[in-house]
Design a protein with these regions (language model features):
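N-terminal glycine/serine-rich phosphate-binding loop of ATP-dependent small-molecule kinases
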Residues: 1-96, 124
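Glycine-rich phosphate-binding loop and adjoining helix at the ATP-binding site
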Residues: 55, 86-148
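A broad, structural surface signal
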Residues: 48, 52-59, 63, 111, ...
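Short, flexible active-site-adjacent loop segments at beta-strand->alpha-helix junctions, enriched
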Residues: 81, 90, 104-105, 164-166, ...
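Gly/Ser/Thr-rich active-site cleft segment
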Residues: 9-11, 122-180
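Short active-site oxyanion
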Residues: 73, 97-98, 152-157
């Protein structure tokens, strides 16, 4: 018999659940992690905490279900969408905390884009509303405000993604840089 692990990497905790071939829960684990609020309206997570809680909760779920890792057929990840980060392409080290989906630090930049008259264009091209929730303005903030980020990105030394991308990259030992 094989098993599936479902990982829910959420905003305040990570939960992993092992299911059998009838989709019955056979093991689970959950861990909370620290949120960081460096300024008003800012919300960040340490990416290493996110990865550590995924690994720890998977181990707890396997132990809880008395399952061996080699019995796992697949792993699925659901995560806090639009939480974004950069990490070093070689070492895997994050260059800054992950900026959480709730973060509002790019509100003024979004307002400027609106006043410049590009909101409709952005929505037409992306299908998304102009809002700090989405990754693009966070990406710009990271490039503009994290020392060395822009030059490292231009040199091809950084990877960017949402939390699922970061987790997949680390769980595959840097083989896969992907998202859904």
């Amino acid at each position: 018999m094989g098993y599936i692990i479902a990982v829910d990497q959420g905003t305040t905790s990570t939960r992993s659940i092992v299911f059998d071939d009838q989709f019955a829960i056979v093991g689970q684990g959950q861990e909370e992690f620290e949120q960081h609020f460096p300024n008003s309206g800012w919300v960040e997570h340490n990416p290493k905490d996110l990865l550590a809680t995924v690994i720890a909760t998977c181990k707890k779920a396997l132990n809880d279900g008395k399952i061996r890792a080699k019995e796992i057929l697949a792993l699925g990840i659901t995560n806090q969408r639009e939480t974004t980060l950069f990490w070093d392409k070689v070492s895997g080290e994050p260059i800054y905390n992950a900026i959480v989906w709730q973060d509002r630090r790019t509100s003024k930049f979004c307002d400027k884009l609106r006043s410049d008259g590009v909101e409709e264009l952005i929505t037409r091209i992306t299908g998304l509303l102009l809002d700090p929730y989405f990754s693009a303005t966070k990406l710009k903030w990271l490039l503009d405000n994290v020392e060395g980020a822009r030059s490292k990105a231009e040199a091809g030394e950084l990877l960017f993604g949402t939390v699922d991308t970061y987790l997949i990259w680390h769980l595959t030992n840097g083989v896969m840089h992907a998202t859904d």
